[in-house]
Amino acid sequence: MKCLKTLLVSTTLLTAFSLNAEVTLEQQVKITEEGLHFDGRNLDFSNVGTPDTGEKYDYFFGPNISAHGDAVKTYRHYVFMTWYKGGKNERNVMLSRYNTLNGELSTIEFPHKHTGFRGDPLVGESHNTIGLSVSPINGTIHMVFDMHAYDNNNHGGKFKDDFFRYSFSVAGAAELPHSEFTLDKFVKDTSEVSQGDDDYKHLTMTGDLDDKGNFARLTYPKFFTTVDGTLLLYMRLGGNNNGAYVFNRYDAETESWSTFTKFNENNQKLKGNQYNWGLYGNMKYVNGKLRVGFQQRSNDNSDKYKYQNGVYYAYSDHPDGFGDWKNHKGEPMTWPLINSDEIKVFEPGDYISHTEANSVYIVGSFDWTVTEKGDIHIISKVRSTDRGRADYEEVYIHSYKPAGAEEFIISTDFPGASEIYTSGDNVYIVGLEGGRPYVEKAQGGTNNFIRVYEASDGPVFDHGTLYIKDGKVYYYLMERTSGTAMPLYLQIIDLDLESDANAPIVSFPSPSVTVNQGYEKLSLNISAESPVEGRSIQSVSLYIDDELVRTDDSLPFLFGHGSKPHETGALGWLDRHEPNPSPLSAGRHVFKAVAVDSEGDSSTATMILNVNSNAPIVSFPQESLEVDEGFERLSLNISAESAVEGRTIESVSLYIDGGLVRTDTSLPYLFGHASKPHETGAMGWLDTHSPNPSPLAAGSYEFTAVATDNEGEETTASMLLVVKGEPEPPIVTWPNSTVTVYEGYEKLAITIDAETPVEGRDIQSVTLFRNGELVRVDTRPVWNFGHSFAPYEFGAMGWLDRHEPNPSPLGVGTHTFTAVARDSAGLESETDMALIVLSLPGPSVMINEGDISLLTEYQNLAITAEASAADDDISLVSLALYIDEQLIREIYEPPFIWGSDAYSTELLSLTEGTHLVRVVATDSNNKQSESSIFINIDLLGDLNKDSIVDKADTRLFTSKLRAGEIMDIRYDFNGDGVVNNRDTRGLVRRCTYSRCSSN
C-alpha cells in the first residue's frame, strides 16, 4: 500500500491557502496479462484497405480499446471490468470481477470477437468500447459493446441484424460464488436473428425485434445509476457533425429496457435550424440529475473552427431525464433540443485571436462535472490549428459556476487536464504523469487545484479509465509494454473524504453582488464556523482576483468596514475616508474567503462582484462583417452614449488595424459616408467618387471605435472586417437537380461531376449525404453512387438477383442528397439534389357513361367502366359500384358492367332525386382510385319540376304538344307509338292528388 500525505501551497494563492489531504492507494491487482492493444499503424481512408496481415495490429482512430470507455463499475464489494482479449487473433469480449474483500478474481470469456473497423478484423477500432453496468436492485449485469454507428445497410451490409450488441445476465449473477460466475449465467439470443447456440448478443434491449430501428447507428455506450438504483444508458446517434444523444431506462422490477429517447434532434436543419450539428462531450448522471455537456461540431466548414466550437450545458429536473430540461440558468429549453444556442455557456474560440477559416482547433481536453452542492466545472482547450505558425496560440480554460452563482467564471489560469471528476464537494483531476497515477484536488466552486497524490514507483502505465464511487477511485489501467496483448491492472485509491467532512463551513452573504463603478461602500460579513465540536476558526483570509487582501483572526470576520473602507474596492463613504486611489475597475471580480480552523483544516468560498462601468457605451452595427474584395461601399454608423446621467460624448475615433482614420465630434458618428467613401477601405459608389487608390485587399482587419465622454473616460469597441478574395473551390454538379421516382423503385444510380478550376489541384473526395446523414466517402473517380455494389445508397430496393430487398427504402416525400467535393487544397463545395419519392398511383378507372337523367318507372339502366393498373407489376383486384355510398356489387374481372344480363334489375330501384354513382378500383397494393357520375331521376309527368303531378302539368303537357315540342316516348301512355293529345288522360291518371282535373 502506498500513502502520500502532502501539504501543498497553491501558486494562485501564494502562501495563504493550504489543503491537508491523506490520499492512499488501498489496493493494486493485476487483472490479466492479455488485454488487447493495437500496436500497428494509425490508418486513414487512403490506406485502410491495405492493413498489416502479420503480427502488427493496425488501427483506425486510436490504439486503445481495453481499459477504455465505460469499462469499470462497482457492485457492493465487487469491482467489474470489461476488456478485449489479446492478441490480434483472439479479440474476445471479456468480463472480470474482483472481490475486494478476499482478492478473488473471476473472469468470463464471451464468444464474440472485436469485429474491427467497419467489419475488417485486421483493423482495430478504438471507438468500439464496452459499456458496463450492474443493477443495484436485482444484481443483473449489462454490457453494450463493439459498435460504431452501424445499421443493417452501411459498410456493405456487414452488420445486418448484428449492428447493436447487448448482453445481460440473469438476476443475482453479479454476486454468485466464484465457481458459479460463468458464461451460462448470461442469456442467449434465441430470436429469429440469432447467430447460433453460442450467441449472447441481442439486437435490441427491449427484446422486441420490431424496435430494432431504435437501436441503429449508435456509438459510445455509457451507463449510469440514479439515486434510486435505476439504470440509464446513453449513446450517440448518428455522425460527427449531425448527431444526437439518446438514452433509455432499465426497469429492474420487470427486467426490461425502454427504447431510446433523444436529448436532441439530429438532422436539425430539417427542423428549422440553420445548420446540422453533432456533439462531442458527455451525458452524465451526477449530483442526482441527468446532465449534458458538450462541444458542438457543425457542418459549416467555412467558419474559423476546424472542428468543434462552443461549450454547451443542460440538466433535467426529471428523475430519469424524460423531460424538464433546462440550461445552466434554470431556464427551460426546447426538448428534444434543436438550436444548441439555447444552452450555450461561452465560446472558447474567443480566447485566441485567429479569425481565418479553420484556424481554431478545439478538440480534446474537454470534460465537465458537478459537485454534490451544485458547483459546475467545465474544462476545455483551444489552440491554433497549425502548430507551425509563428503566432501559435494555446489556451487551457477552466470555466466554473459556484453553487448559487448566476454566471460562470472563465479562468485561463489553468494548467490543463483531459478529464475532471467529482466526489463529495470536491473536484478532482486524475491522470498519468510519467506513466504513473496522480490526483489533484480543488474545493468545488474554486480553481485552486493542488496535487494530493502521486505514485513514484510501481508499473508504468500506458492509459486508463476510472470510476469514482463513495470517495474511492477505481482506476483501471493498461501497463505500457509491447505487442497486441498487454497487462491490465486495477488500482483502488481512497480520496479521504472523511477529513473533508471536518473542514470549516465558510460563506459570503450572497454568491454574487452587482455595483456601479465608483461604488462608495461594500462591507462583507463572512460567516465561518467548524462542524467539529471543540474546534474553532483561527482565521479568515479574503482574496480579490487571487490577491490577498487581509487575514482576519477574530469575530466578526468583517471586511470593508468603516476603518478599512478600501479593502473591498470601494471609494469610501465617510467624510474621514480619503478617496480610494485604486478602486476596483469595471468588470467581474472573484472574491474568495479562506477559513482555517484550529486543526489547520481549511475551506474556501467564492463570491462574484460585477462592477458596472461608467465609461461610454460604444458599439458597431455588428461585431463582424464579411465583404468581397473590391467592395464599393461600407458606411458604419457607430453608436455611442454615456452610461452616466449628465455626461455627454465628446468624440468617436475610428482606427483600422491601429491606424487612426478620423475623429468625429458630432452626431451621427458616421464613417464611410458619401463625402468620405474611401475611409473604410471601399472603392466608392457614386459617379462623383474616384476609385480608391488604396482599397482594403483580401484579409482580416480590426476596426476599433474609441468613444470619449466629457469626463475624459474612454471605451473601445471592435469589429472584424473580413475582405474575401475570390476563392476557387471545386465545382460539383448533379446531372439533375430534381429526380422524381415512385416508392419501391428498384434502381437509382447517379454519377456526380466534380472538377477543380485551378490547375495543379485535383479532387480528393466526393462525399454523399442523405438528409444530412453520411452515406459514403468516395476517394477515387468516377464519383458513382447507387451502383450495383451499393444499390441502396439512393434508397432503391435493388435490382439484381444478388440484391436483398432494401430493408430501409426511402419513404414518400422529398429527400435531400448533398454531394460535397473536396480538393487537394482542402477547399470544399457542395450541391443538393432533391429526390422526390411519390406514392405509387392507384389504378386508373373511368365510368364510360356521362351523367344520366331518367324518369321514374324507367325500365333499363346499365353502367360500364374501364380500369387498368398503374404498373405491369401491379394487378387489378376489383371494381366496386356504389350508389349513394351503398355497395351495389363488386366485380373481380372484366367486363365491368352493372345492370345487364343476370343483374339487369340491380339498378332499377332508384327513386326520384339525384344519386351519386361511384366506381372504386382496387389494385394489388391496396391502392384505390374512383370515378363518379350523377344519375338524376325525375318524377314522370312532373313537367314543371315542382315534385308533384297536377293540373299545371297537364296544361303544360298540352301546351308543349301544341308547340310541337318533342316529348319523351314514355309519355305515350296509350301505346300507339306517338305522343299526342290522346295521351293526356294517361298523364291525368298519374296525378299526385285525386281529382287532378279539378285542381
UniProtKB/Swiss-Prot annotation:
Residues binding substrate, per UniProt: S126, H127, Y280, R297, Y361
Keyword hit for Glycoprotein: no
Protein residues bound to Ca(2+) 1: D189, D199, K201
Signal peptide positions on this chain: 1-21
One GO process term, biological-process aspect: polysaccharide catabolic process
Binding of Ca(2+) 2, residues: D300, D303, Y305
Protein name: Ulvan lyase, long isoform
